[in-house]
Swiss-Prot record:
Gene3D superfamilies: 6.10.140.1740, Zinc/RING finger domain, C3HC4 (zinc finger) (3.30.40.10). It comes from Homo sapiens (Human). A motif (Bipartite nuclear localization signal) lies at residues 127-148. Residues 115-164 are annotated as: Disordered. GO terms for molecular function: histone H3K4me3 reader activity; methylated histone binding; transcription coactivator activity; zinc ion binding. Homodimer. Component of the HBO1 complex composed of KAT7/HBO1, MEAF6, ING4 or ING5, and one scaffold subunit: complexes containing BRPF scaffold (BRPF1, BRD1/BRPF2 or BRPF3) direct KAT7/HBO1 specificity towards H3K14ac, while complexes containing JADE scaffold (JADE1, JADE2 and JADE3) mediate acetylation of histone H4. Interacts with H3K4me3 and to a lesser extent with H3K4me2, the interaction augments KAT7/HBO1 acetylation activity on H3 tails. Interacts with EP300, RELA and TP53; these interactions may be indirect. Interacts with EGLN1. Interacts with BCL2A1. Residues 25-118 form a coiled coil. The record marks 198, 209, 213, 221 as: Histone H3K4me3 binding. The lineage of its organism: Eukaryota, Metazoa, Chordata, Craniata, Vertebrata. This is Inhibitor of growth protein 4. SMART domains: ING (SM01408), PHD (SM00249). GO terms for biological process: apoptotic process; chromatin remodeling; DNA replication-dependent chromatin disassembly; negative regulation of cell population proliferation; negative regulation of DNA-templated transcription; negative regulation of growth; positive regulation of apoptotic process; positive regulation of DNA damage response, signal transduction by p53 class mediator. Disulfide bonds: none annotated. The modification Citrulline is found at residues 133, 166.
Length: 249
């Protein structure tokens, strides 16, 4: 496949990437704004509670505290959603980077294959020229036996032609030997060593993930499938390890 074809295919694959990135960034900005609005509401409720705590009944105090707690819960949900969006955005860009790496590897493999074919052709051409030179030398030898004029002219002609044959490979494509290229070497691209790993499976982020509500959790983020989830649970969620630790306490 020509270089232009690889470039065209890659550009087609990233055609929608700017729009997808713009959408995710806009969603994150919206989440930021909603979080700021909730924080302002929390400050207002907290001020109201502090200023009128003595005059409020127990039921009214509990109602205000519940509103504050629910607002904080919403803020955390928005924060989790923003982190999820950030992970999806990273994965989206990383997928295209891997695609580019794969296309570059395939293009390099094609170049090597063409160089090997050119080297084989150059080698076969050199053998043909050597064979032709031997025949011409025989003709020159026969010409020398026919007379002095032929004896002087033929060797010069033969030498001239021999000289051209010997120097011509220098202007041809050089012989280059490469190792065999397998499709698996191209398709099995290594994982980015700088990409962080998560979950009990110690894999990179992909798909839907959920964060553990234990602030001291050493893993923090988990794939839905690895912890047996299909939808995001309501309220606080603790990973299996943190749940066991909480039960021990």
């Amino acid at each position: 496949m020509a270089a232009g074809m690889y470039l065209e295919h890659y550009l087609d694959s990233i055609e929608n990437l700017p729009f997808e990135l713009q959408r995710n960034f806009q969603l994150m900005r919206d989440l930021d704004q909603r979080t700021e609005d909730l924080k302002a509401e929390i400050d207002k409720l907290a001020t109201e509670y502090m200023s009128s705590a003595r005059s409020l009944s127990s039921e009214e105090k509990l109602a205000l505290l519940k509103q504050i707690q629910e607002a904080y819960g919403k803020c955390k949900e928005f924060g989790d959603d923003k982190v999820q969006l950030a992970m999806q955005t990273y994965e989206m860009v990383d997928k295209h980077i891997r695609r580019l790496d794969t296309d570059l590897a395939r293009f390099e493999a094609d170049l090597k294959e063409k160089q090997i074919e050119s080297s084989d052709y150059d080698s076969s051409s050199s053998k043909g020229k050597k064979k032709g030179r031997t025949q011409k030398e025989k003709k020159a030898a026969r010409a020398r036996s026919k007379g002095k004029n032929s004896d002087e002219e033929a060797p010069k002609t033969a030498q001239k032609k021999l000289k051209l044959v010997r120097t011509s490979p220098e202007y041809g494509m050089p012989s280059v030997t490469f190792g065999s290229v397998h499709p698996s070497d191209v398709l099995d691209m290594p994982v980015d060593p700088n990409e962080p790993t998560y979950c009990l499976c110690h894999q990179v982020s992909y798909g839907e993930m959920i964060g553990c509500d234990n602030p001291d959790c050493s893993i923090e983020w988990f794939h839905f499938a690895c912890v047996g989830l299909t939808t995001k649970p309501r309220g606080k969620w603790f990973c299996p390890r943190c749940s066991q630790e909480r039960k021990k306490k």
